[in-house]
Amino acid sequence: MSEAKRRAAEKAIEYVENDMIIGVGTGSTVAYFIDALGRTPKRIKGAVSSSEQSTAHLKQHGIEVLELNHTGTLPLYVDGADECDPYKRLIKGGGASLTREKIIAEASKQFICIIDPNKQVATLGKLPLPIEVIPMARSLVARQIMARTDGQPVWREGVITDNGNVILDVHHLRITDPVKLEQELNQIPGVVCVGLFARRCADLVIIGSEPPHIL
């Protein structure tokens, strides 16, 4: 599995150009990408990071971490996913960094998702759907989710996001219309971000098969 992640990550380096400022996501596959960034002879101007974890990793390789407010639109964003369907729609948020990931994806011209083959699914929803929630609204949001969907929200106890919020993981969802569900869940008061990347899906998916496959 680690080899598949490494293959996807190293393939993504081909899309990095000198003097770029790139967006960098979070997770085990992205960690391989950051390591590959540190080894490549290409020299980027810096990176916008989606988490404190990735920020620390980038700095270990001497890569300057920049604020999105100061960079404007980014040419490229590279991140992983928990699930990916044939239409490049994603479930993300296993690492609890979904809000910053969605912000950077929206701010980027090209969003490349790097995954191992096991992350491919015919229909999203095999894994729980993470939702970042304002702490005081946790119970309200959970009730609203149960009223609006067939899902079962579970509080990810002990996890606080980099934004100071909590995560509800919604199990047993039948996601037949990802864009519609993303919009509906976003309307619940107290929801900060839904881990469905359907409206802003990936532009390119690199699957770390042997050899890597492009979707």
From Swiss-Prot:
Molecular function, one GO term: ribose-5-phosphate isomerase activity
Domain of life: Bacteria
Active site per UniProt: 101 (proton acceptor)
Entry annotated with the keyword Isomerase: yes
Pathway: Carbohydrate degradation; pentose phosphate pathway; D-ribose 5-phosphate from D-ribulose 5-phosphate (non-oxidative stage): step 1/1
Subunit structure: Homodimer.
Protein name in the entry: Ribose-5-phosphate isomerase A
Organism ancestry: Bacteria, Pseudomonadati, Pseudomonadota, Gammaproteobacteria, Lysobacterales
